[in-house]
């Protein structure tokens, strides 16, 4: 629930974040770890850190902006722009969302938390982060690059011959099928946290972590749907078109 400006006055950080977990991210952007200043009032934090309350609220409001474009808009976008949109999401995941969650988990004090999965989460998440980053980099350097080659070849017939060997090396159909059928990267964490359930969770720090993980899981699902329902189907059609053109060129020669 978004906490309005008038409701921030004389409120402790713990109360503000408890009512609206996204204020934890907003505070983080101003160099404030909410769990280190939980008993401070917002006015005191603004003075200590040297920022205005209105700036904090403005940043918090910006976090409500829609993560995704309308699918219909992406369906009609040129394919190279769909790729750029997905790369933008990758950049957001790697440089913004995941480092923030990783920092929250690393700084979780488990000494006073009687949940076994807290230590498990501290152990598992760094490995997840590393594997996810490697997956994204591989996707960009191989799959996205290949799809961009298809796009530019379609707009410049001189590039067609350059695609011949790439099309022999990459099975876009198999990649698309594997991507559609693979388990979500978050399935293990989802199971560990019982679908991010806040039942019986008293630690505010842990509640924020769970809600951030849940939000990331949702964002990742949207991202995967764009790849599965828009990017790959359109790229496969384009690949078929270019394959036919290459066959025609070969026949004429």
Task: Describe the residue ranges of each PLM region.
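Small-residue-biased structural context
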Residues: 1-253
């Amino acid at each position: 629930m978004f906490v309005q400006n008038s409701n921030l006055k004389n409120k402790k950080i713990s109360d503000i974040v408890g009512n609206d977990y996204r204020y934890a991210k907003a505070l983080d952007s101003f160099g404030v770890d909410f769990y280190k200043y939980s008993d401070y009032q917002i006015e005191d934090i603004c003075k200590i850190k040297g920022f205005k309350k209105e700036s904090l609220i403005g940043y918090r409001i910006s976090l409500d902006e829609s993560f995704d474009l309308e699918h219909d808009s992406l369906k009609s976008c040129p394919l190279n722009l769909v790729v750029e949109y997905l790369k933008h999401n990758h950049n957001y995941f790697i440089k913004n969302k995941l480092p923030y969650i990783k920092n929250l988990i690393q700084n979780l004090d488990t000494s006073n938390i009687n949940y076994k999965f807290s230590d498990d989460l501290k152990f598992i998440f760094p490995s997840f982060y590393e594997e996810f980053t490697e997956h994204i980099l591989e996707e960009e350097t191989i799959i996205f690059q290949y799809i961009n080659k298809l796009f530019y070849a379609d707009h410049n017939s001189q590039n067609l011959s350059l695609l011949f060997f790439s099309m022999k090396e990459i099975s876009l159909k198999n990649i698309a099928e594997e991507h559609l059928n693979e388990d979500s990267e978050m399935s293990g964490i989802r199971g560990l946290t019982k679908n991010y359930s806040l039942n019986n969770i008293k630690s505010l720090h842990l509640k924020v972590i769970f809600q951030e993980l849940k939000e990331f899981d949702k964002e990742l699902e949207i991202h995967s749907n764009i790849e599965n329902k828009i990017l790959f189907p359109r790229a496969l059609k384009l690949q078929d078109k270019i394959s036919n053109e290459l066959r025609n060129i070969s026949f004429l020669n």
